[in-house]
Structures are given as C-alpha cells and as structure tokens.
C-alpha cells in the first residue's frame, strides 16, 4: 500500500567545449572529461538517511568518435526524497555545484560551459497510516490471507497527495528485479490481487 509520495526532480546537464583532435589538440578540454568530474563531485555528496534521499546519474551520452575531443556530453540526473524540504535542499546544493563549475577559472577560461535543464518534477506528499482509506486497503488485503506492507513511492498518487487529497496506490501482485533486464512479476497472485482491489473499491462506499 503506497501512502507516501516521494518527491522527484530530474535534470539533463550538458557540458560543452570547443572539442578538437585527440592528438593535435591534446590538452584542450573534453566535454566528457569535464562532465565526469562533475559526476564525481555530485555523487560524493552526503545525503540524509531520514527522510530517505537519493541521487542517481542514470544516463550519460556524448562524443562523436574515439579520436575526437568531445565538444558536447550530457547526463541525466534523478533526485528523490521522502521529504519535500530535503529534496529542496538537495536541489539547491546540486544547482550551486553546477553554477560553481561554470565559474571556475579552469573551466571558464578554457571555454567550458555547463547547462542544466529540468526534465521532470513530481511533488512529495502523504497521508497517515491511520487514515480510513489506508485502513480499508489493509483490511482488503488481509481478507485474502495476505499481510499488507505500507511503503512510499513515486506514483500517479503524487499529485493528489501533494495537494492534501487522500490517495493511495495498491499493488496486485509481487515481483522483483525492478528496472533491470530481469524484471518480473508473479502471475499466480494476480487473481487474489484483483479480488482485494475489487473489495477495496466496494468498501469505500461505507466511508
């Protein structure tokens, strides 16, 4: 039962340089090298464990050939937190590091620039585990002989929860290997999962 929404903010950060030939222009800044330095700096940041806060560089692209000093490279950065204030603080720190990277003499004098574009944003929120909706959801699961688990996630419920409206997300089966090539769901529990979902919808009318 998802009753807490994780706040999310995502960036595409692009490094740009003049580029050049790997031999004749050796020593000229590479967008890939400069972006890699920024990745190391960002991922070295200490993040709070409570509320849980995470950072992930999930994608890197750039360059045109093995013997070319890259003139452009980009990364996609995912920031998450169960706390809105913690996410805002992390966002502030990340943006300051990007701004600082643009003002360093070693980069600015060499013609290196960094640009940050927001490519995704989801607000945080949540309702108490004691809320009637959550109690009904847990009861519907127990009726199927299963023990419910309360958790947080980034789902379609983020928007209503962030605006103070009661909302939740119910799972209908189990699985594993999320976001890997081995991701899977178990088919057998789906029948019970659908039954608990139907029972939950019916029980809402009693509120």
Regions found by a protein language model. Give the residues of each.
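Metal-dependent amide/peptide-bond hydrolase catalytic core
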Residues: 2-4, 9-207
């Amino acid at each position: 039962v998802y009753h807490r929404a994780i706040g999310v903010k995502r960036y595409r950060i692009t490094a740009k340089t003049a580029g050049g030939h790997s031999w004749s222009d050796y020593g000229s800044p590479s967008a890939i090298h400069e972006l890699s330095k920024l990745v190391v700096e960002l991922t070295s940041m200490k993040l709070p464990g409570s509320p849980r806060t995470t950072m992930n560089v999930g994608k890197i692209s750039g360059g045109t050939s093995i013997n070319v000093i890259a003139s452009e490279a980009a990364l996609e950065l995912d920031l998450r937190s169960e706390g809105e204030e913690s996410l805002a603080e992390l966002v502030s720190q990340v943006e300051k590091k990007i701004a600082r990277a643009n003002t360093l003499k070693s980069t600015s004098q060499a013609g290196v620039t960094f640009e940050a574009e927001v490519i995704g944003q989801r607000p945080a929120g949540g309702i108490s585990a004691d809320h009637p909706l959550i109690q009904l959801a847990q009861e519907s699961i127990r009726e199927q002989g299963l023990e419910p688990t309360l958790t947080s996630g980034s789902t379609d419920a983020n928007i209503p929860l962030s605006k103070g409206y009661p909302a939740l997300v119910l799972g209908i089966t189990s699985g594993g290997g999320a976001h890997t090539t081995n991701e899977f769901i178990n088919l057998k529990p789906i029948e019970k999962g659908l039954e608990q979902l139907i029972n939950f919808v019916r029980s809402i009318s009693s509120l």
